A protein has these predicted regions:
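Conserved class I S-adenosyl-L-methionine
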Residues: 126-137
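Conserved SAM-binding loop of SAM-dependent methyltransferases across substrates and taxa
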Residues: 137-149
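Conserved beta-strand signature within the Rossmann-like core of class I S-adenosyl-L-methionine
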Residues: 234-242
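N-terminal auxiliary segments of SAM/dcSAM-dependent transferases
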Residues: 1-90
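Class I S-adenosyl-L-methionine
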Residues: 243-280
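Conserved alpha-helix/loop element of class I SAM-dependent methyltransferases that forms part
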Residues: 110-128
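S-adenosyl-L-methionine
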Residues: 155-199
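A short glycine-rich, Lys/Arg-flanked "PGG" loop and its adjoining helix->strand segment in the class I
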Residues: 219-233
Length: 280
């Protein structure tokens, strides 16, 4: 799917555009692509002109919601399939997303993109072949491309998440010249797809699964054995776990992950908000 290049509006941005016009100006300068770039936007009574295309003024917009031009009106970037999935703006520019109201990426203290960059640095992707198990919005993949990865194979199970990616200017486009053909994005369940990958075929792995209660199979010994099979000796794996409350959950997920990874043939330790492991 090709990536969207039209305007992205929040309630605040739309209000700023309208306020500028009502103040007597016919031009607004700023970003309508979530702080990826700045543009001059021409304002009129009928609406605004962005990148040589005219758009009407939007109707009433909701808070914490991003809107895109759907051809006839500005529509929220959300879908309801098996769950309500929604792209959510942040103060950092790069958006997060929610599934049934549960935020999937950290945003309280750091940009989700910068958070991904810190984790990617742990596996030193430059020149390597890398497996990205749960692609999400593609921030791991984008940071790997930025860092000079040789090749990255990324899986994402949810088609609605893949749709969000086409509307998010922070998500990497596999077809873009900047990707240079290095990103292969596949819709599929990595717990099954990994069985098709050759042994010792990747140099590093980034594993960012949903929480244990949603995708327990991605924390299983069977899956960790597959990760061990496909990664070369000395290869690094970063496994996001978050910091689940041991008192309320009754379990120490990061320590359980370390134990299973070591059984699978890794040397593992706590790192950032997850586990860093090296194939022995």
């Amino acid at each position: 799917m090709s990536h969207y290049t039209g305007p992205l509006l929040t309630r605040e941005t739309a209000a700023d555009l309208h306020r500028t016009f009502e103040g007597g100006a016919d031009r607004w300068h700023g970003s309508l692509d979530l702080a990826r770039s700045d543009d001059d936007v021409i304002l009129s009574a009928d609406g605004f002109r962005f990148r040589d295309h005219a758009y009407p003024w939007p109707g009433k917009l909701k808070d914490r919601t991003l809107y895109y031009w759907g051809g006839e009106e500005f529509a929220p970037i959300s879908r309801f399939g098996s769950a309500l999935i929604k792209l959510v703006p942040t103060e950092w520019g790069a958006p997060t997303f929610e599934i049934d109201g549960i935020k999937m990426l950290p945003t309280a203290k750091v940009s989700p993109f910068d958070d991904a960059r810190r984790k990617v640095e742990l596996v030193a992707p430059a020149g390597k072949s890398l497996l990205d198990t749960c692609g999400g919005l593609g921030y791991f993949a984008a940071c790997c491309l930025e860092a000079g990865v040789g090749q990255i194979r990324s899986f994402e199970k949810n088609p609605d998440v893949l749709w969000l990616r086409t509307l998010n200017p922070w998500s990497p486009d596999p077809a873009a010249a900047s990707a240079g053909g290095r990103l292969q994005l596949t819709q599929g369940d990595v717990s099954k797809e990994i069985e098709t990958l050759p042994a010792s075929s990747v140099d590093a792995i980034l594993h960012d699964p949903p929480r244990f209660g949603i995708a327990g199979e991605l924390y299983s010994q069977v899956f960790y054995d597959q990760l061990s099979r496909v990664i070369r000796k000395g290869g690094r794996l970063f496994h996001y776990t978050g910091a689940p409350n041991k008192l309320t959950s009754g379990r120490d997920v990061p320590r359980e992950v370390i134990k299973r990874l070591e059984k699978a043939g890794f040397k593992a330790e706590l790192a950032l908000d997850g586990v860093l492991a090296t194939k022995r």
